[in-house]
């Protein structure tokens, strides 16, 4: 539910009739709600380098997760499904492709297309997002360095 691309990239895509595929639409699983301040990451887990996953930022970002949980409970769905449904509702030229390392995530993520948000629900989400400050980055410079390969 990162909104930083709404200022320039998404309006440009819309104007030029270009589709947009958001990178990591569930913010590396953050929007799934399955991680908390006590979650321990090991080895080469990318979340070790993402400041959104440090304990104090997880706590500060709890209002976003609470909002998603409330809507998910009301719609008999998951926070991840609500996040994806919001994206699909908001832009008809957007195609989120969430990561799916487990079979059950496939059904869960595809199920987001069946969730219909009313205009009132959508507007409420937008209003709440306007009030929420997101702490920490979803992709930090360290991650960019990890994935960057320079052509020689």
Predicted regions and their residues:
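Beta/alpha (TIM)-barrel catalytic core signal, keyed to glycine-rich beta->alpha loops juxtaposed to Asp/Glu
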Residues: 1-127, 146-152
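Short coil/turn segments at secondary-structure boundaries
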Residues: 137-142
